[in-house]
Amino acid sequence: MIVGIGSDLIDIRRVEKALERHGERFTHRVFTEVERVKSDRRRMRAASYAKRFAAKEACAKALGTGLAQGVFWRDMGVVNLPGGKPTMHLTGGAAERLNALIPAGHRPLIHLTITDDFPLAQAFVIIEAVSVE
């Protein structure tokens, strides 16, 4: 059963300006170490960061909190499964909120799709409660 849906659209140029203006102060405040390492290796660095930013916003919306109620930027990180498919790894307040959404006898499954087509980056998140039986 679907317990949360979120989407976000961001202008890559906005992230590009934040990177130019604030550099590591911005990246260390918003992104996990895994995300920073991956994005910093990309040729289209700003687009990579923008997709991850959009994914965090979409995830926060799917959790039903936005970036409030104990959910912080670095509590949500984009990670890739062994086959390369992106998903979200949640910690801290985001993980607590996720667990509160999931009914007994179920486990959470987070679906993520991210894309970019300059000047836009977009993400969709669906949180599903899957029966453990």
Swiss-Prot record:
Metal-binding keyword on record = yes
Which residues are recorded as binding Mg(2+)? D8, E57
Question: Could you give a single Gene Ontology term from the biological process aspect?
Answer: fatty acid biosynthetic process
Catalyzed chemical reaction(s): apo-[ACP] + CoA = holo-[ACP] + adenosine 3',5'-bisphosphate + H(+)
GO cellular component terms attached to this protein's record: cytoplasm
Name the Gene Ontology molecular function terms of this record.
holo-[acyl-carrier-protein] synthase activity; magnesium ion binding
Q: Sorted alphabetically, which InterPro entries does this protein's record hold?
A: 4-PPantetheinyl_Trfase_dom (IPR008278), 4-PPantetheinyl_Trfase_dom_sf (IPR037143), ACPS (IPR002582), Ppantetheine-prot_Trfase_dom (IPR004568)
Name the cofactor(s): Mg(2+)
What Gene3D superfamilies is this protein classified in?
Answer: 4'-phosphopantetheinyl transferase domain (3.90.470.20)
Which cell locations does it reside in? Cytoplasm
Instruction: Name the Pfam families for this protein.
Output: ACPS
> Which UniProt keyword terms apply here?
Cytoplasm, Fatty acid biosynthesis, Fatty acid metabolism, Lipid biosynthesis, Lipid metabolism, Magnesium, Metal-binding, Transferase
NCBIfam families recorded: acpS, pantethn_trn
HAMAP family found in the cross-reference section: AcpS
Please give the function described in this protein's UniProt entry: Transfers the 4'-phosphopantetheine moiety from coenzyme A to a Ser of acyl-carrier-protein.
Question: What's the protein name?
Answer: Holo-[acyl-carrier-protein] synthase
Q: Which organism is it from?
A: Chelativorans sp. (strain BNC1)
Q: What is the lineage of its organism?
A: Bacteria, Pseudomonadati, Pseudomonadota, Alphaproteobacteria, Hyphomicrobiales
